[in-house]
Amino acid sequence: MSIPAEQISSNWQTFQSYIEKYIKGDRKDQLLKFYNQHQEELVLMPASHKKAYHNAFPGGYIDHVNRVIECALQLHNVWGKMGADTTTYTVEELVFAAINHDLGKMGDGVEYAHIPSKDEWRKKNMGEMYQFNKKIAYMSPIFFFLHSSLEGI
């Protein structure tokens, strides 16, 4: 599967609109700065490496994150209607978590986590459109990269 360039662009605008609408103050400013700084990588990233998994195509990451945000907001509304205690978190925190839930897939700040596979056999027979980038450690210290980039939020 793939999505056209217009949809990738529209998905990016939707993604940014979630930040604008649900995130406030300095946290919003920091997120917009970070995501705009990494826009080129993020808009083309896949959400997963294998065709059988979700969104393993260019533009898949932001498409996936947008759907996670929408799902989180819908679940929040359903939980509220069912009488669940939704006062233990804010909608801002919920959206913040949804926005950033897969950020480690970005890589380590120097290298991408997933790179296009050059192995035609694995692509054809296993559906592995991307491979894990061996230049970065599995479960690399992305936290430290992100922490320094998202200081204070």
Tell me the role of every PLM-derived stretch:
Residues M1-A47:
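Non-catalytic interface/linker regions that flank or bridge core catalytic/transmembrane domains
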Residues I8, I19, I23, V43, ...:
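Extended aliphatic helical segments
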Residues T14-Y18, C71, M139-F143:
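A general alpha-helix detector
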Residues F34-D85:
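A glycine-rich, hydrophobic loop/mini-helix early in the fold
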Residues H54-F57, D63, L75, A84-I153:
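Divalent metal-dependent catalytic cores for phosphoryl transfer on phosphate-bearing substrates
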